[in-house]
């Protein structure tokens, strides 16, 4: 049986509960778009009241003017999926961690933190997962400029740009 998308009628009921949330009623596969402030409560309702017991994956998209978090949730009993999105400020992208409800989010949130610079509040171990601990940038951001590695006193340091001389 093919997985179905969460119905527009049920999405409309969620928007009644969370009036700042929206969805595209014309879309074939509508996503629930929420504020970062509402995200923890929305996620809790989706898990506890709507049966979304599995987080398939999460990722982030840099749209230059904002960072968009994208979560793919599944209700395994009803064979239903839902995409939840939240726009974050590019200058300081912050959102509550999903790990309290979905422990499997731990490593994916670390990856998004490392590569996109999103801070996940309440994350149990928020640190880099791919880049060196002292790496000064987030390489999947559209404003990324590769720092230049340099050895100083036997230690690797990162320069914001290449030295001119």
Predicted ranges, named:
Residues 1-165:
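Terminal low-complexity/charged segments
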